[in-house]
Amino acid sequence: MGYKEGSAKKGATLFKTRCAQCHTTEAGGPHKVGPNLHGVINRHSGEAEGYSYSDANKRKGIEWTTEHLFEYLENPKKYIPGTKMAFGGLKKPKDRNDLITWMVENC
């Protein structure tokens, strides 16, 4: 099972409660513990300008499509061993779909 469009409204709540403490999304916004996510959809892994990524993220060599994000957000450390991301993941496919739908519209 892969990405299916979800609820952007529910995704906004998930972003605020699970992601915003480490990430910003506005154009030109600062990096925090994690990189600014503006423009992340279809960007290559490890390429947000000015952010210090782990070698693992740089080497992953993927484009952040909705499908890759769906897999990654389930278990970031399994998808990219060596990532600095300390987030344990969203186990429910519905939550990942909602968050990614919001990201497509807002990042």
From Swiss-Prot:
Task: List where in the cell it is found.
Answer: Mitochondrion intermembrane space
Q: Which SUPFAM superfamilies match?
A: Cytochrome c
Positions modified as N6,N6,N6-trimethyllysine?
K77
Provide the GO MF annotations for this entry.
Answer: electron transfer activity; heme binding; metal ion binding
Chief subcellular location: mitochondrion
Any one cellular-component term (Gene Ontology): mitochondrial intermembrane space
Q: Matching InterPro entries, A to Z?
A: Cyt_c-like_dom (IPR009056), Cyt_c-like_dom_sf (IPR036909), Cyt_c_1A/1B (IPR002327)
Cystine pairings recorded for this chain: none
Highest taxon of the lineage: Eukaryota
**Alphabetically ordered keywords of this record:** Electron transport, Heme, Iron, Metal-binding, Methylation, Mitochondrion, Respiratory chain, Transport
Give residues annotated as binding heme c.
Answer: C19, C22, H23, M85
Question: Mind listing the GO biological process terms from this record?
Answer: mitochondrial electron transport, cytochrome c to oxygen; mitochondrial electron transport, ubiquinol to cytochrome c
Record PTM: Binds 1 heme c group covalently per subunit.
PANTHER family attached here? CYTOCHROME C
Q: What does the UniProt record say this protein does?
A: Electron carrier protein. The oxidized form of the cytochrome c heme group can accept an electron from the heme group of the cytochrome c1 subunit of cytochrome reductase. Cytochrome c then transfers this electron to the cytochrome oxidase complex, the final protein carrier in the mitochondrial electron-transport chain.
User: What family is this protein classified in?
Assistant: Belongs to the cytochrome c family.
In Swiss-Prot or TrEMBL terms, this protein is called Cytochrome c
Native species of this protein?
Answer: Yarrowia lipolytica (strain CLIB 122 / E 150)
- The gene for this chain is CYC1
